[in-house]
A protein has these predicted regions:
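WD40/WD-repeat beta-propeller blade N-cap
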Residues: 87-100, 137-144, 180-186, 231-235, ...
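Short coil/turn segments within WD40 beta-propeller repeats
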Residues: 98-101, 118-122, 142-145, 163-167, ...
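Intrinsically disordered, low-complexity acidic/Ser/Thr/Pro-rich linker and tail segments
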Residues: 2-102, 228-229, 236
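Loop/turn segments within WD40 beta-propeller blades
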Residues: 103-109, 148-154, 190-196, 256-269, ...
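Blade-level signature of beta-propeller repeat domains, shared across WD40, Kelch, NHL, RCC1
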Residues: 393-432
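Conserved beta-strand element within WD40/beta-propeller blades
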Residues: 112-116, 157-161, 199-201, 271-275, ...
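Short loop/turn segments that connect beta-strands within beta-propeller blades
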Residues: 126-129, 171-174, 212-215, 285-288, ...
Length: 432
């Protein structure tokens, strides 16, 4: 591994010479504070995120934080003794028959969803690897491109497919509660922090907003702080409505929302959109007006993820690099790369925002394994051995509150016994 110390690309501001972005969002800081090097101890024991613009501190429920955070120097020693649990899906009939395209944990980390090219959509209990304890959700007629749990409802799942539909599921009742036809191949989704908005991306470079209206219930922070009204867990009465599409003039890939809760006083939202030009556009929602542009990579930007601390925005590119952007000033602090790297089609952060990993599904790009990087230094600190020397990694997802890392591999060639499938480092008695 080498950390490419490139000169930070310039960030483009839209018609504003004052150093601030237009639209009244100041510098769009989404971190609640500016950590010094590896300063994440304040997360210990926390049960909420306060990851918002500097003008708008609000509460976002999440899984409880672990009190024992791993430091860079400890990581390799701890992970070296951790086992990897495999989850075998009966839908896998042989090498390459069951490539998982997408992974997603629910907010509490008690469930993980897998969406596959063979149309299999399955919900797993990470503590019980046997498929008999999993749930098979059926209905899609094309490859499943993306799965995503609601950030505010632990049993609500969304999936999008090449069949041109977006489906919403209640995983407790194993039913599809809504089906929306988006008129073309859908391949990416992102959900706003309050669960009220989803944006779906199609392969024709059209973004489609979806309004999600829940029955609301007041939510109180464990310390007695009254938070926003969040959706009730009671099923029913939720409506899903596809709004007017927003065609984009350039190739549009992954999207993500910040961890910012809109309020009646500050209803504005923003969304990050990666493009085939190597840029990341920060857009106002729901207008989709561009307020800021990051010149992130020399080729297409394919994946994007905001650190749970709000400190960094990670962008994966087809140039085999992951760039880390400081959200306090929108400067690229460092780039990460692997010796055998390929196009980075997925990127994920550990719950404490210290460690980041990328997914490359090209055969051979994983080399000797899956590399984990320390965000603050850019160092490669541990490599997880993956099945098959030539296997690619199609998807990665850190657990929302533990040092468990879920990933899936692609087939590693004709005659191989490796048929991909879900693997979780640390789960089911694995040691973390």
């Amino acid at each position: 591994m080498e950390t490419a110390d490139l000169s930070p690309p310039e960030a483009t501001r839209e018609n504003d010479d004052s150093g601030s972005m237009r639209g009244g969002v100041a510098t769009l800081n989404i971190a609640s504070h500016t950590p010094e090097a590896d300063d994440t101890e304040s997360l210990s024991g926390a049960s909420t995120r306060t990851l918002v613009s500097s003008e708008l501190p609000t509460l976002v429920p999440m899984a409880p934080m672990r009190p024992d955070l791993l430091h860079k120097e400890q990581f390799a020693l701890v992970f070296g003794g951790v086992k990897t649990q495999s989850y075998s899906d009966p839908a896998a009939k042989g090498p390459g028959s069951h490539t998982i395209r997408s992974l997603a944990w629910n907010p509490t980390g008690q469930l993980i969803a897998t969406g596959s090219a063979d149309r299999t959509l399955r919900i797993w209990n990470p503590d019980r690897p046997n498929f008999r304890y999993s749930t098979d959700l059926r209905g899609h007629t094309g490859a499943i491109e993306k799965v995503l749990f609601s950030p505010v409802r632990d049993a609500e799942l969304a999936s999008c497919s090449a069949d041109g539909t977006v489906r919403f599921w209640d995983v407790r009742s194993k039913t599809c509660v809504s089906r929306l036809d988006v008129g073309g191949e859908a391949f990416t989704m992102s959900w706003s922090a309050d669960g009220s908005t989803m944006v779906v991306g199609k392969k024709d470079d059209t973004l489609i907003p979806i309004s999600v209206k829940y029955p609301s219930a007041p939510t109180t922070h464990p310390d007695g702080i009254k938070a926003l009204n969040l959706p009730s867990s009671t099923p029913g009465a939720t409506t899903y409505t596809a709004l007017d599409p927003h065609p984009q003039s350039v190739q549009t890939n992954a999207t993500t929302f910040p961890w910012c809760m809109p309020t009646p006083e500050h209803p504005e939202q923003h969304i990050f959109v990666t493009t085939g030009e190597g840029k990341v556009k920060i857009m106002e929602y729901p207008s989709f007006d561009v307020v800021h542009t990051l010149n992130a990579h020399t080729s297409a930007c394919l994946s994007i993820a905001l650190a749970p601390t709000g400190r960094y925005l990670a962008v994966g590119g087809s140039d085999a690099l992951i760039s880390l952007w400081d959200t306090t000033d929108w400067i690229c602090r460092r780039t990460l790369s692997s010796e055998n790297g390929g196009a980075i089609r997925g990127v994920s952060w550990s719950f404490d925002g210290r460690f980041v990993v990328g997914a490359c599904d090209e055969l051979g790009c994983s080399g000797n394994g899956l590399e984990i990087f320390h965000a603050e230094s850019g160092d490669s600190i541990y490599t997880i051995p993956t099945a098959g020397h030539n296997a690619g990694v199609s998807a990665v997802a850190w657990h929302p509150s533990r040092y468990w890392l879920a990933y899936s591999t692609t087939t590693d060639g004709p005659g191989s016994s490796n048929s991909g499938g879900l693997k979780i480092v640390g789960a089911a008695g694995g040691g973390l």
